[in-house]
């Protein structure tokens, strides 16, 4: 789609098992415009220690702020807004299926880092919008966080 329409300025990602508030997209776009960064309502500052990343440790050591950072990993459950130019052309490379087929947040982070873009929260603290209850059993969250699958993708 990006190849076909040069008028697209922003790409917003969302989960289909979350209920978003009315002005949700507006907050993302305004923050992205203000900082020239990828914006999110929820993200974690990556912790690197002993030669690898620890996603679960990162969750517990968030630096809550609204300052853009290369360390912030946006998590898509509450929505992410990307500037069109922040998405590296490799985002369409199908090799990601070999490394992170079910960890799209990590793949998008790698693509925006390689394009030189920081990430920023819309609000100082993470916001997790309400889940649609019928979707809980198959959520990627269950697999990626509770089964430590995100750690494996970050390595």
Each language-model region and where it sits:
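Glycine-rich, histidine-containing beta strand-loop boundary motifs that form or position
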Residues: 15, 43, 123
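Residues in and immediately flanking transmembrane alpha helices
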Residues: 10, 28-30, 118
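Short beta-strand-to-loop acidic/aromatic patch adjacent to the donor-nucleotide binding site
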Residues: 8-19
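C-terminal catalytic/acceptor-binding lobe
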Residues: 89, 93-155
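A conserved donor-nucleotide-binding helix/loop in the catalytic core
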Residues: 1-9, 107-108
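Residue-level detector of structured alpha->beta connecting loops
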Residues: 7-9, 36, 116
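Conserved catalytic core of nucleotide-sugar-dependent glycosyltransferases
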Residues: 2-5, 19-96
């Amino acid at each position: 789609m990006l190849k076909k329409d040069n008028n697209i300025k922003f790409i917003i990602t969302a989960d289909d098992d979350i209920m978003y508030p009315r002005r949700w997209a507006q907050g993302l776009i305004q923050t992205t415009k203000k900082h020239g960064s990828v914006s999110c309502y929820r993200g974690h500052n990556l912790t690197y220690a002993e030669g690898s990343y620890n996603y679960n440790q990162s969750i517990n050591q968030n630096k809550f702020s609204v300052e853009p950072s290369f360390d912030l990993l946006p998590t898509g459950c509450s929505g992410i807004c990307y500037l069109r130019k922040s998405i590296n052309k490799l985002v369409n490379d199908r090799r990601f299926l070999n490394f992170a087929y079910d960890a799209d947040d990590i793949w998008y982070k790698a693509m925006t880092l390689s394009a030189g873009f920081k990430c920023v929260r819309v609000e100082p603290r993470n916001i997790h919008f309400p889940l649609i209850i019928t979707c809980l059993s198959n959520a990627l969250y269950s697999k990626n966080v509770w089964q430590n699958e995100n750690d494996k993708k970050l390595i």
